[in-house]
Amino acid sequence: MFSANIARKVVCSVCRASLRPTVCPVVYRGYRGDAPEPTILEIPLPPWQERAGEALDIKRKRLLYESRKRGMLENCILLSLFAKQYLNTMSESQLKQYDRLINEPSNDWDIYYWATDTQPTPEVYQGEVMDMLKEFTKNRDMEQRLDAPNLEYLDKSS
């Protein structure tokens, strides 16, 4: 009886190993080799449009939310801390620049690379707000920035 169980396990593992090469290419995602470009699916994003007639307090709240809820943790931390420090003191033109900066690019990594001066910033995003973000990113005060700030600072009753 004992040897039959061992034999069954050996046979099962051999069968799995022999089937693995036919199953893995379907399940495994990795190098595509020389696959032609049309097989890549690109989901089009709607183009960014400035919200005309939006009240400044509503815009600040929306930008705070959008600064905190990014597609990558690095930008969540960086932009939420930046928004905490600067958003309430920004002028209307600065808010428009910031809105365009965080919402128009389709790739969050681009924003991160521009803010950290890893890649050159396109002319359309160059401006006062980008300069403020780049300076903030340098972290000259050597603050520990490991997480997005709590929202307690927004509670005006405290």
Curated annotation (Swiss-Prot):
InterPro entries tied to this protein: SDH (IPR005631), SDH_sf (IPR036714), SDHAF2 (IPR028882)
GO CC, alphabetical: mitochondrial matrix; mitochondrion
Top-level taxon of origin: Eukaryota
Pfam families for this protein: Sdh5 (PF03937)
Span of the transit peptide along the chain: 1-17
GO biological process: mitochondrial electron transport, succinate to ubiquinone; mitochondrial respiratory chain complex II assembly; protein-FAD linkage; tricarboxylic acid cycle
Location of the protein in the cell: Mitochondrion matrix
Key words of the record: Chaperone, Mitochondrion, Transit peptide
Tagged with keyword Transit peptide: yes
Main subcellular location: mitochondrion
Function of the molecule: Plays an essential role in the assembly of succinate dehydrogenase (SDH), an enzyme complex (also referred to as respiratory complex II) that is a component of both the tricarboxylic acid (TCA) cycle and the mitochondrial electron transport chain, and which couples the oxidation of succinate to fumarate with the reduction of ubiquinone (coenzyme Q) to ubiquinol. Required for flavinylation (covalent attachment of FAD) of the flavoprotein subunit sdha of the SDH catalytic dimer.
Family: Belongs to the SDHAF2 family.
HAMAP family the record matches: SDHAF2 (MF_03057)
Subunit structure comment from the entry: Interacts with sdha within the SDH catalytic dimer.
Entry protein name: Succinate dehydrogenase assembly factor 2, mitochondrial
Record organism: Danio rerio (Zebrafish)
Gene assigned in the entry: sdhaf2
